């Protein structure tokens, strides 16, 4: 056994262990040295000032990032810095959700990043804070973001599967299959793993699906959010509610009918949900017919002729 290198800065796990309950899980994991550094901070004025100085440095880089060949990387570095210094995730101090919102909206109409997996991964980080992820995935499909990436279909299908909606999860995978989601070998492996779980946990629906004469709905035109929300789920609801832009006359800013232009921010949703308390004495509640949820619209995908020929 080789001796330990005394010159290296070894991380004592006891330091991390003391604050592990305040660390938000990440698929990519956390840097041990960054965790130890953030866990050992006493939050003195000096430390806070240091963090603020570093944050302003990232903000200045963003202000001048438009002239760069790859402005997205500046945002990625900023997000990584936030996650390293605030492993607990979204807090008032970290501002993580606001940062994710700013980044995702910055490049929605930038064709350079439509199929950039780095940009898609930032959306996948943001979806963890969304009450109804179906709307976010529909928004991405509407703007042709990540439609050639296996990650998009994996994460979308995982959402339905976690709620026991195996057939809808299968629809998502079928879309990915037709789009030849990349890397395709990874996509195939993920789909095989999904079908094994489906057969194990819901064999009846799996059998009825494979024996069905009519093809399953693939447009998600009638996806019912209430149905999904009421389904038994193992995942607790995130803190933030997802809202979407709605144009009263049905036309988007660019003149296209029904164009889904943008998404509401957490701040906007909080203001909308902040109803001031008033006295109900003598008030009458108007009778209204049950409100129907607006359809999510078709699950549109970008069909590239070159991809179709492959």
From Swiss-Prot:
Basic and acidic residues bias: start-end ranges: 42-63
Region of interest (Disordered), residue spans: 20-63
Domain of life, source organism: Eukaryota
Main location: nucleus
Binding partners and assembly: Component of the mitotic checkpoint complex (MCC) which consists of mad2, mad3, bub3 and slp1/cdc20. Interacts with the chromosome passenger complex subunits ark1 and bir1.
Protein name, per record: Mitotic spindle checkpoint component mad3
Protein location: Nucleus; Chromosome, Centromere, Kinetochore
Keyword Nucleus among record annotations: yes
Cell cycle among keywords: yes
Protein encoded by which gene: mad3
Keywords: Cell cycle, Cell division, Centromere, Chromosome, Kinetochore, Mitosis, Nucleus
Function: Component of the spindle assembly checkpoint which is a feedback control that prevents cells with incompletely assembled spindles from leaving mitosis. Component of the mitotic checkpoint complex (MCC) which inhibits the ubiquitin ligase activity of the anaphase promoting complex/cyclosome (APC/C) by preventing its activation by slp1/cdc20.
InterPro entries noted in UniProt: Bub1/Mad3, Mad3/Bub1_I, TPR-like_helical_dom_sf
């Amino acid at each position: 056994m080789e001796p330990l290198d005394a010159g290296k800065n070894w991380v004592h796990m006891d330091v991390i262990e003391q604050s592990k309950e305040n660390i938000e899980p990440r698929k990519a994991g956390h840097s041990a040295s960054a965790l130890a550094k953030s866990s050992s901070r006493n939050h003195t004025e000096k430390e806070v000032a240091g963090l603020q100085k570093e944050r302003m440095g990232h903000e200045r880089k963003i202000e001048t990032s438009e002239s760069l060949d790859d402005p997205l990387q500046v945002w990625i570095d900023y997000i990584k810095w936030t996650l390293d210094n605030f492993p607990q995730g979204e807090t008032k101090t970290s501002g993580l959700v606001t940062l994710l919102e700013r980044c995702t909206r910055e490049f929605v109409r930038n064709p350079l990043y439509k199929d950039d997996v780095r940009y898609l991964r930032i959306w996948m980080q943001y979806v963890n804070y969304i009450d109804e992820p179906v709307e976010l995935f529909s928004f991405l499909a509407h703007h042709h973001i990540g439609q050639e990436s296996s990650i998009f279909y994996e994460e979308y299908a995982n959402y339905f599967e976690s709620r026991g909606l195996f057939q809808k999860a299968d629809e998502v995978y079928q879309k990915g299959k037709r789009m030849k989601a990349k890397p395709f070998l990874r996509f195939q492996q993920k789909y095989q793993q999904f079908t094994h779980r489906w057969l194990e946990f819901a064999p009846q629906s799996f059998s009825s699906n494979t024996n069905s004469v009519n093809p399953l709905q693939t447009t998600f035109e009638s996806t019912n959010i209430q149905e999904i929300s009421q389904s038994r789920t193992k995942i607790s609801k995130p803190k933030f509610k997802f809202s979407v832009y709605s144009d009263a006359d049905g036309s988007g800013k660019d003149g296209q009918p029904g164009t889904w232009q943008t998404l509401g921010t957490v701040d906007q949703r909080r203001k909308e949900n902040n109803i001031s308390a008033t006295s109900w004495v003598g008030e009458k509640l108007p009778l209204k017919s049950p409100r129907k949820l607006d359809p999510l619209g078709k699950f549109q995908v970008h069909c590239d002729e070159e991809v179709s020929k492959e």
